Amino acid sequence: MEPLRLLILLFVTELSGAHNTTVFQGVAGQSLQVSCPYDSMKHWGRRKAWCRQLGEKGPCQRVVSTHNLWLLSFLRRWNGSTAITDDTLGGTLTITLRNLQPHDAGLYQCQSLHGSEADTLRKVLVEVLADPLDHRDAGDLWFPGESESFEDAHVEHSISRSLLEGEIPFPPTSILLLLACIFLIKILAASALWAAAWHGQKPGTHPPSELDCGHDPGYQLQTLPGLRDT
């Protein structure tokens, strides 16, 4: 079992060094947030996904993806203990791994989907630490092993933390924009209804006076000629 594990560790180490891989370190039992920045204009209208790399040339098995409707990408979607949310205006894809476990360690990808193809936004190597106070000791790393092997990898400041139950993150830019659009639409609709009601009134028309007694002003009383001579 140990030789097999050593081979896996060496494989992941070489793979992470060959690519521009970012290392995210998390503590077992806590939550880890992974951020993947991207060009919001280039990837406008595209769904995003989080997948796990299977082998050097194997496929990247999808773990979770954003909402099928791109406009709702800001909504958090869960698959087991993994969540994904996309700030399409800010250009940041955020993945949350809740209750981090040793088997969660490994190589992942943030992807931008277009049709049947996918562009890699960032390669991520997740490390699971046994003790946050002793994370520099290689013996406390479940995966992938010694830190000296990641000379070419960029270590992100992403030590995991416990999420409080009452903690509510600030809404992303997409939510604020959606609320602003809804508010603007309501204002425009109210203005249109008010304008239609104002134009519907006919200026200069007055209700009939009580002195008319119901007679048509076009008819007048005339004296008969025979009655005038008598």
UniProtKB/Swiss-Prot annotation:
Consequence recorded when altering D134G? In PLOSL2; uncertain significance; decreased protein level
Mutation effect (R76D): Decreases binding to THP-1 cells
Instruction: Provide the binding site for a 1,2-diacyl-sn-glycero-3-phospho-L-serine.
Output: H67, N68, R77, T88
Q: Could you tell me the keywords of this UniProt record? A: Alzheimer disease, Amyloidosis, Cell membrane, Disease variant, Disulfide bond, Glycoprotein, Immunoglobulin domain, Lipid-binding, Membrane, Neurodegeneration, Receptor, Secreted, Signal, Transmembrane, Transmembrane helix
Q: In UniProt terms, what is the effect of altering C36A? A: Loss of proteolytic cleavage by ADAM10 and ectodomain shedding. Decreases protein maturation and cell membrane localization
Origin superkingdom: Eukaryota
Outcome when changing T66M: Results in defective protein maturation and trafficking; loss of proteolytic cleavage by ADAM10 and ectodomain shedding; increases protein aggregation; decreases cell membrane localization; decreases phagocytosis; loss of LDL, CLU and APOE binding; greatly decreases LDL and CLU uptake into cells
Q: How would you summarize where this protein is expressed among tissues?
A: Expressed in the brain, specifically in microglia and in the fusiform gyrus (at protein level). Expressed on macrophages and dendritic cells but not on granulocytes or monocytes. In the CNS strongest expression seen in the basal ganglia, corpus callosum, medulla oblongata and spinal cord.
Function according to Swiss-Prot or TrEMBL: Forms a receptor signaling complex with TYROBP which mediates signaling and cell activation following ligand binding. Acts as a receptor for amyloid-beta protein 42, a cleavage product of the amyloid-beta precursor protein APP, and mediates its uptake and degradation by microglia. Binding to amyloid-beta 42 mediates microglial activation, proliferation, migration, apoptosis and expression of pro-inflammatory cytokines, such as IL6R and CCL3, and the anti-inflammatory cytokine ARG1.
The name on file for this protein is: Triggering receptor expressed on myeloid cells 2
Q: Which organism is it from?
A: Homo sapiens
Give the organism's phylogenetic lineage. Answer: Eukaryota, Metazoa, Chordata, Craniata, Vertebrata
